[in-house]
UniProtKB/Swiss-Prot annotation:
One of its GO terms (biological process) is tRNA threonylcarbamoyladenosine modification. One of its GO terms (cellular component) is cytoplasm. GO terms for molecular function: iron ion binding; N(6)-L-threonylcarbamoyladenine synthase activity. Belongs to the KAE1 / TsaD family. This is tRNA N6-adenosine threonylcarbamoyltransferase. It is an enzyme of class 2 (transferase). Pfam families: TsaD (PF00814). Binds 1 Fe(2+) ion per subunit. PROSITE patterns: GLYCOPROTEASE. InterPro entries: ATPase_NBD, Gcp-like_dom, KAE1/TsaD, Peptidase_M22_CS, TsaD. It is found in: Cytoplasm. Fe cation binds at H111, H115, D302.
Length: 333
């Protein structure tokens, strides 16, 4: 079966056509990085306006690349939450219009579920059950995945998301947007042991995260020592990044050990970070039998192919959305 999916939850306008929930026939993304760079972050109004301009062109491009017309589609899936309400509305309205015009079933998809199942687009897909760590600009959450549509939240950030900590930290250091990419690049030239930052974790046995204190520690460091340049800036980036990565890895493997999971799926935009990917792989080697699934960086950032995977299985479960489908910016998985 073939699903057309539309994703507009934040600042990427995306459309994809996926066959049988495993093979992407087309995966088109129109990025807004250049639009938001001058502001140092995503401006919701600008994001929504650009989605209006780009949503139908990316759908047309996906159909063209896949060599598929409306008659070759079984259903349409769309991200209806969580995310920016104006951005979500553009995708939802486009999907409803196409479903009506083409007389196709419509399925709503939770954006976080899309990230959790993105690994099924890789050559080697995980088997259930597995732990899913979703790390992005708006979310840092740890889930137990028991099957498609069957997830249990184990822990989440109590304040800033990891991606937000990267972006705000980069802005504080005068680095360009997107900040996580800039920090990752500079950190490769730095010493992660140069500066000691506090652990960005919640004390105790729970699996929640907290990054606001780490961000404050970076601010105090810059106020005290000034903004470094050259090797000093690289060391600061590497040390700050290491503190974020250490918290993510520690909590994920604490959950694996406690709940006796031997599969971990890493997803979300921050999962494209080279140090995080390396640290997860390194820690996994310490656990006999532990399998780690790291989707390609393109599948970690927002895309519609992952929405199509989740949409395929929602469709097979008999889920359908009606003409009253609306954006749900706070939709919890």
């Amino acid at each position: 079966m073939r699903i057309l999916a539309i994703e507009t939850s934040c600042d990427e306008t995306a459309a994809a056509i996926v066959e049988d929930g495993r093979r992407a026939l087309a995966d088109v993304i129109s990025t807004q990085i250049d639009i938001h760079r001058r502001w140092g972050g995503v401006v919701p109004e600008l994001a929504s306006r650009n989605h209006v301009v780009q949503v139908m062109p990316v759908v047309d491009e996906a159909l063209s690349r896949a060599g598929v017309g409306p008659d070759g589609l079984d259903a349409i899936a769309v991200t209806s939450g969580p995310g920016l309400v104006g951005a979500l509305l553009v995708g939802v309205q486009a999907a409803k219009a196409l479903a009506l015009a083409w007389q196709k079933p419509l399925v709503r998809v939770n954006h976080l579920e899309g990230h959790l199942v993105a690994a099924f687009l890789s050559e080697t897909a995980p088997a259930f059950p597995y732990l899913g760590l979703v790390v992005s600009g708006g979310h840092t959450s740890l889930y137990a995945a028991h099957g498609f549509g069957d997830y249990r939240l184990l822990g989440q950030t109590r304040d800033d998301a990891a991606g937000e900590a990267f972006d705000k930290g980069a802005k504080l250091l005068g680095l360009p947007y997107p900040g996580g990419v800039a920090i990752d690049r500079l950190a490769k030239e730095g010493d992660a042991r140069a500066i000691r930052f506090p652990k960005a974790i919640v004390k105790g046995a729970d699996l929640d995260f907290s990054f606001s204190g780490l961000k404050t520690a970076l601010l105090h460091h810059v106020k005290k020592h000034g903004l470094p340049e050259g090797k000093g800036l690289a060391d600061l980036c590497a040390s700050y990044q290491e503190a974020i990565v250490r918290a993510l890895v520690e909590k994920a493997f604490r959950a694996a050990r406690r709940l006796q999971y031997d599969r971990l799926v890493l997803s979300g935009g921050v999962a494209a970070n080279s140090r995080l990917r390396g640290a997860v792989a390194e820690r996994a080697r310490e656990y006999e039998g532990m399998e780690v699934f790291l989707p390609a960086p393109r599948l970690c950032t927002d895309n519609a192919a992952m929405i199509a995977v989740a949409g395929t299985h929602a469709f097979l479960r008999g889920e359908r959305a009606g003409a009253d489908l609306n954006a749900d910016p706070a939709w919890r998985l």
